[in-house]
Structures are given as structure tokens and as C-alpha cells.
């Protein structure tokens, strides 16, 4: 049987978890096997910016950061389950990637 590997990425931890919960509910309703959600390492992007606009004075910096949270879910590729997965409303800032594997 084929498996579907679902990779979720997003900057908001709560939104990523709600999408994971919806996928888990679909798997329970359809009765397919589910592995995950497996938390992947969080990527932390840091951008230091100099506070002073002219370069004079003390070297003080602002540090801006963005964290990208990732989850991995393996689910059996049942036709009914995949149709329901396609109907999930995913927020705009959440990336979802589905790969079918045999």
C-alpha cells in the first residue's frame, strides 16, 4: 500500500499544531495508520541590524529573529483519507507538502 508523507512548515507554532490535529482526526475517522507528527528541528533565522543610522556612536544592535517550525506525518494513502486531506483549510502562512511513496 502507498504511503503519503506530509511535511508542514510554518512560523506560527499554534497554527502548525492545529493542522496536525486536523490530519490526526481524519486518520482516526477513516481508520488508516498514522505515524507522527514528528517534530523536526526548528530553524532559527537571526538578522542583526545596527541601531545607529549613520555609523557613529556605540555599536548597538537590534536582533530580529524568525523561527520556522516543521512537522512530518506519515499516513497510509487511502483514497478516502486523501480526499479529506485535500479539503483541509490550511492558513496562508503554513506550507504543506504531500509526497506519495510506494
From Swiss-Prot:
Keyword Ribosomal protein: yes
Classification via SUPFAM superfamilies: Ribosomal protein S10
A GO molecular function held by the record: structural constituent of ribosome
InterPro entries: Ribosomal_uS10 (IPR001848), Ribosomal_uS10_CS (IPR018268), Ribosomal_uS10_dom (IPR027486), Ribosomal_uS10_dom_sf (IPR036838), Ribosomal_uS10_euk/arc (IPR005729)
GO BP field: translation
Gene Ontology cellular component terms for the protein in this record: small ribosomal subunit
UniProt KW keywords: Ribonucleoprotein, Ribosomal protein
Role played: Involved in the binding of tRNA to the ribosomes.
Subunit structure: Part of the 30S ribosomal subunit.
Family: Belongs to the universal ribosomal protein uS10 family.
Identification of the protein by name: Small ribosomal subunit protein uS10
Annotated source species: Methanoregula boonei (strain DSM 21154 / JCM 14090 / 6A8)
Amino acid at each position: 500500500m502507498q504511503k503519503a508523507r506530509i511535511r508542514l512548515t510554518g512560523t506560527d507554532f499554534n497554527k502548525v499544531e492545529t493542522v496536525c490535529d486536523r490530519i490526526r482526526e481524519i486518520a482516526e475517522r477513516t481508520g488508516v495508520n498514522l505515524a507522527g507528527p514528528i517534530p523536526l528541528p526548528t530553524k532559527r533565522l537571526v538578522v542583526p541590524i545596527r541601531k545607529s543610522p549613520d555609523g557613529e556612536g556605540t555599536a548597538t544592535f537590534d536582533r530580529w529573529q524568525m523561527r520556522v517550525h516543521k512537522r512530518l506525518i506519515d499516513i497510509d494513502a487511502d483514497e478516502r483519507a486523501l480526499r479529506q486531506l485535500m479539503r483541509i483549510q490550511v492558513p496562508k502562512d503554513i506550507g504543506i507538502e504531500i509526497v506519495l511513496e510506494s
